[in-house]
């Protein structure tokens, strides 16, 4: 607590009057005027003041001159102003958190003073009257919760007479529903009766100075040190967005900010200020719960531009203050906010005005006639492709909330495809309808999908190996120049086509740009030159391109082929690309980000990202704040546990096919309401991911067939494109010589690719490839992963059960090979996902003789890695929702009154839906706010969690960066 009222026994003459004033921080001048009017109305409505006993005017003057100020060390920005006079005790809370306000309200109710006044004035929602605080909100529901506290009830019952409590609060919304309270004389919003006085005017002026909106540089402080953070592994930062939500999704080469939260002091700022660029901003819905945090960032960007044009100050200090990430494309639908603050401005109108001043044209999100055609946000050969699927709104309803699905397909065959859902306020029925249109996609039909799994059918349909592969690659690629105008891609980063050219690019000397000098501070790990993302730049590989957003499915279908870099030929070179186009010239055209040549991932994770995934000690129930943070306190679906503890079941990292050296406890949050057991420390926490893969890699085995000797492992190989580009490239195709037949040499082993040991397989499995796995095509080579391998002892046990048990396993588990001795120590459990069917699965993928998946029935489940639950009163979530939307990690966000009222039903629906899953998958639940409903549900259903494999994390996780911690939960995939 920032300030605690003294107990009545500690003073000789306790005050007969208590005054508690709560003022929320104002983000705009118009909002400040409304708050001051509410404060004056509340003080003048206190009819219990007897002028013969207490002179309110003199007591307020004494408060202004003699009060003591306390700054909270727990809640940064919260202040408490306290003064105790002869007859009046006054406490003013400025910019408090929800917990601080509830604690002070509890102290006010338990105080024996006979007359009390509570003034609640601050930014509040027009719909419900809920006050927006620094963290969370305060509504009539929270007021009744404090009144129902056992200690408060005992104090009211023991009082000789029922104390009088006057409450001045919003006159609209749910506050009008408050009724009589036993043991308390409650008066709600009485009319103003006291006259205006000089002391009241001085009191209001002093409070107004404390509530003035801070400057953008004070609200969003610059980092203490220079340098930029590089996020090399796919991850998602879950921020406590207050009444809304805020998230930050990142892959190697592209970052996406989703919403901004309700707090003007952006919860995501302490992370993004360490980045050189935010490539995309996605606003699922416009309102007071999602845009204030984003608008604060836009105001800072505009203030930076004005400061740069102003008088020159100290050069170093000026550069440090102007340090902020560049902004890429912004997706925003609504032109008016769905929810507003009383007395405040429309956040959606404000956001569009700020974007217009910055020269950024927001782009709408709308589902096309064929929702399976995504918008490619980012694609780079050798790295991967990030796709955006719009599930909602349908065509013709641009103002509706947006629902977006991000799918990351890495280039490495053994890496996991990451699927993250951001529904915003989309109604669950429409969300399920949008997912049903995508349920045929292979990446959504299994709990675990890798790039190798997605490419297997295309390789199975090819019989001509080299000849057909080369002809399919070279001829259509030359038509990509003519199809540039048909792209729907936000950002493209080509790579050179041959390995020799790649080596020359890495080893040759390059001249760093001016922006690279900012990467020399602490935390800068990637020291290779990169092209600046803000302002003029010197292109290294190619010039930036512009392309309009796809308006029809025909344009979206050409995304893939047009974005792949062409093969080197005399008629096509990167220097011949069209010139760049300014991003704000036309709202119908989408500006591609300038090219940033990213270096290939290094062998050691520590050399590519400063974040380390380390175990964290679980905190006790109700601990006040974190006592242990790391460079990146995270949640990782990746566990390697000792074999001697069969009773401990932790969620595993289902996605990676390569065994990871990191041992991470999923309970990596502090404070953590729900304590868990902590696994033993990792054997080699400093070892790299790639080195661990190479150590666990089986010995090289000669290919047993022609198809196995031709894996698509080279990032430099051109990729086949569709026939739609043949016409555009016919002229250049005639000038190129025909490809020379060649037999490629055997390629070195790559993580995620291994050969099957024939001796370790059951007798029935020692058959030709076309009969080993009946669910795959006969021509598909068996490429099981090395990450999910099991010890030989597990293979022997499988032999005794017979091959029937293998047929009952899902495809993702059936493709796991038997392990070789020495790959995984026998004293440790392998990182194998628990995907054993509980019953005969009707949702398992099946393939016909042609290798094509069988059509799915309506209502088939969709598997995701992380999914936010629809919030903001979007609709009721029943067990059918969790039966259809199966995610390894669910996020509950939005600490609003409507959210808490239906929270218990949502949590019970999760248990009921998870109980009907046919696959035994580990599920993690991440709430972004603390709730008594969540605590009570956890205590009552904890036994079911263990049986169903559900892990509930605490809501107080912290991430440390440059010796400063901020609330967030990092989920690594």
UniProtKB/Swiss-Prot annotation:
Annotated localization: Nucleus; Cytoplasm, Cytosol; Cytoplasm, Cytoskeleton; Cytoplasm, Cytoskeleton, Spindle
Biased composition (Basic and acidic residues): 490-506
Keyword Repressor (UniProt): no
Annotated tissue distribution: Expressed in ventral and dorsal horns of the spinal cord, hippocampus, cerebral cortex, molecular, Purkinje and granular cell layers of the cerebellum and in dorsal root ganglia of the PNS (at protein level). Expressed in brain, testis, heart, lung, kidney and liver.
Residue ranges with Pro residues bias: 565-582, 736-749
Modified residues (Phosphoserine): 462, 586, 591, 593, 660, 684, 724
Key words, A-Z: Apoptosis, Cytoplasm, Cytoskeleton, DNA-binding, Microtubule, Nucleus, Phosphoprotein
GO MF annotations in UniProt: actin filament binding; beta-tubulin binding; DNA binding; identical protein binding; microtubule binding; tubulin binding
Record GO biological process: apoptotic process; brain development; metaphase chromosome alignment; microtubule anchoring at centrosome; microtubule bundle formation; microtubule cytoskeleton organization; mitotic spindle organization; nervous system development
Compositional bias of kind Low complexity: 603-621, 703-722, 782-801
InterPro entries recorded: MAP1, MAP1B/S_N, RibonucZ/Hydroxyglut_hydro
Disulfide bonds: none
Annotated region described as Necessary for association with actin, given as residue ranges: 875-973
Positions of region (Necessary for association with microtubules): 645-880
Stretches the record annotates as Disordered: 452-538, 560-853
Main location group: nucleus
Region (Necessary for interaction with RASSF1), start-end ranges: 601-973
Region listing for Necessary for the mitochondrial aggregation and genome destruction, in residue ranges: 881-905
Quaternary structure and partners: Heterodimer of a heavy and a light chain. Interacts with microtubules and actin. Both MAP1S heavy and light chains interact with microtubules. MAP1S light chain interacts with actin. Interacts with ESR1, LRPPRC, RASSF1, microtubules and VCY2. Interacts with WDR47 (via N-terminus of light chain). Interacts (via C-terminus) with GAN (via Kelch domains).
Membership in a protein family: Belongs to the MAP1 family.
Function (record text): Microtubule-associated protein that mediates aggregation of mitochondria resulting in cell death and genomic destruction (MAGD). Plays a role in anchoring the microtubule organizing center to the centrosomes. Binds to DNA. Plays a role in apoptosis. Involved in the formation of microtubule bundles.
Protein name: Microtubule-associated protein 1S
Species for this entry: Mus musculus
Organism taxonomic ancestry: Eukaryota, Metazoa, Chordata, Craniata, Vertebrata
């Amino acid at each position: 607590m920032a300030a605690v009222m003294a107990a009545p026994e500690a003073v000789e003459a306790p005050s007969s009057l208590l005054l508690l004033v709560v003022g929320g921080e104002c983000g705009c001048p118009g909002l400040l005027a409304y708050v001051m009017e509410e404060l004056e109305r509340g003080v003048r409505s206190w009819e219990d003041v007897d002028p013969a006993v207490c002179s309110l005017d003199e007591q307020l003057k004494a408060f202004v001159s003699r009060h003591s100020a306390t700054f909270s060390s727990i809640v940064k920005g919260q202040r408490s102003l306290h003064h105790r006079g002869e007859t009046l005790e006054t406490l003013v809370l400025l910019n408090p958190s929800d917990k601080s306000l509830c604690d002070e309200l509890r102290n006010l109710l338990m105080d024996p003073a006979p007359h009390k006044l509570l003034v609640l004035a601050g930014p509040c929602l027009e719909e419900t009257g809920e006050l927006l605080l620094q963290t969370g909100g305060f509504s009539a529901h929270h007021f009744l919760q404090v009144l129902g506290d056992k200690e408060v009830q005992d104090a009211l019952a023991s009082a000789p007479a029922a104390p009088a409590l006057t409450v001045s609060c919003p006159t609209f919304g749910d506050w009008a529903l408050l009724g009589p309270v036993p043991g308390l004389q409650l008066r709600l919003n009485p009319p103003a009766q006291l006259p205006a006085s000089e002391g009241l005017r001085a009191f209001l002026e002093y409070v107004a100075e404390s509530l003035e909106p801070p400057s953008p540089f004070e609200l969003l402080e610059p980092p203490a040190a220079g340098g930029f953070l590089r996020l090399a592994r796919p991850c998602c930062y879950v921020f406590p967005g207050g009444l809304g939500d805020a998230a930050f999704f990142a892959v190697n080469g592209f970052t996406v900010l989703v919403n901004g939260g309700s707090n003007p002091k952006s919860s995501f700022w302490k992370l993004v200020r360490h980045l050189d660029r935010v490539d995309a901003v996605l606003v699922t819905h416009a309102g007071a719960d999602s845009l204030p945090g984003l608008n604060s960032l836009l105001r800072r960007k505009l203030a930076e531009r004005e400061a740069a044009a102003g008088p020159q100050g100290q050069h170093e200090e000026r550069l440090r203050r102007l340090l902020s990430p560049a902004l890429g494309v912004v997706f925003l639908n609504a032109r008016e906010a769905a929810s507003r603050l009383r007395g405040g401005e429309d956040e959606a109108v404000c956001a569009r005005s700020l974007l217009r001043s910055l020269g950024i044209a927001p782009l709408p999100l709308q589902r096309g006639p064929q929702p399976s055609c995504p918008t490619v946000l980012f694609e780079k050969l050798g790295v991967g492709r990030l796709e955006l699927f719009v599930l909602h709104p349908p065509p013709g309803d641009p103002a509706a909330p947006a629902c977006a699905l991000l799918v990351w397909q890495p280039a490495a065959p053994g890496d996991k495809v990451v699927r993250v859902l951001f529904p915003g306020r989309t109604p669950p029925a429409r969300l399920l309808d949008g997912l049903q249109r995508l349920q045929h996609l292979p990446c959504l039909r299994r709990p675990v999908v890798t790039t190798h799994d997605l490419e297997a059918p295309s390789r199975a349909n090819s019989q001509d190996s080299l000849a057909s592969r080369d002809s399919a690659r070279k001829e259509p690629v030359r038509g990509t120049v003519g199809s540039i105008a048909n792209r729907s891609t936000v950002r493209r980063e080509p790579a050179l086509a041959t390995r020799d050219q790649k080596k020359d690019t890495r080893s040759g000397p390059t001249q760093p740009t001016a922006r690279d000098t900012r990467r020399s501070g602490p935390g800068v790990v990637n020291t290779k030159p990169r092209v600046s993302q803000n302002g003029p730049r010197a292109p290294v590989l190619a010039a930036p391109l512009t392309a309009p957003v796809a308006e029809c499915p025909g344009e979206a279908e050409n995304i893939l082929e047009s974005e792949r870099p062409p093969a080197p030929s005399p008629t096509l070179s990167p220097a011949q690309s069209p010139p760049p186009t300014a991003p704000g010239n036309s709202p119908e055209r989408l500006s591609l980000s300038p090219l940033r040549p990213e270096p290939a991932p290094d062998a050691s994770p520590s050399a590519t990202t400063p974040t380390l995934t380390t175990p964290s000690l679980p905190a006790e129930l109700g601990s006040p704040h974190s006592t242990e943070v790391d460079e990146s306190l995270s949640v990782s679906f990746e566990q390697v546990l000792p074999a001697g503890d069969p009773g401990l079941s932790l969620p595993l990292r289902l996605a990676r096919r390569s065994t990871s050296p990191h041992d991470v406890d999923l309970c990596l949050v502090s404070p953590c309401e729900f304590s868990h057991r902590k696994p033993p420390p990792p054997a080699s926490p400093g070892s790299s991911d790639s080195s661990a893969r190479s150590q666990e890699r089986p010995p090289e085995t000669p290919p047993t067939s022609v198809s196995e000797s031709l894996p698509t492992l080279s990032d430099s190989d051109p990729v086949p494109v569709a026939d739609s580009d043949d016409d555009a490239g016919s002229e250049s195709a005639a000038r190129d010589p025909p490809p020379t037949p060649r037999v490629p040499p055997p390629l070195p082993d790559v993580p995620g690719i291994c050969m099957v040991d024939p001796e370790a397989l059951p007798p029935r499995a020692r058959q030709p490839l076309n009969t080993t796995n009946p669910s795959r095509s006969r021509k598909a080579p068996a490429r099981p992963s090395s990450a999910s391998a099991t010890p030989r002892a597990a293979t022997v046990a499988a032999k005794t059960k017979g091959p029937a048990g293998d047929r009952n396993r899902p495809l993702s588990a059936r493709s796991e090979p038997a392990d070789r001795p020495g790959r995984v120590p026998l004293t440790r459990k392998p990182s194998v996902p628990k995907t054993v069917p509980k019953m005969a699965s009707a949702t398992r993928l099946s393939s016909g003789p042609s290798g094509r998946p069988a059509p799915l029935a309506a209502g088939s489940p969709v598997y995701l890695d992380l999914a936010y639950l629809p919030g903001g009163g979007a609709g009721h979530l029943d067990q059918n929702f969790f039966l259809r939307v199966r995610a390894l990690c669910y996020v509950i966000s939005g600490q609003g009154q409507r959210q808490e009222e239906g929270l218990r039903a949502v949590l019970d629906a999760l248990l009921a839906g998870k109980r009907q899953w046919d696959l035994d998958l580990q599920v993690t639940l991440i709430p972004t706010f603390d709730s008594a409903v969540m605590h009570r549900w956890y205590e009552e259903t904890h036994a079911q969690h263990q049986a169903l494999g559900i892990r509930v994390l605490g809501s107080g996780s912290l991430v440390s960066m440059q010796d400063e911690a901020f609330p967030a939960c990092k989920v690594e995939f």
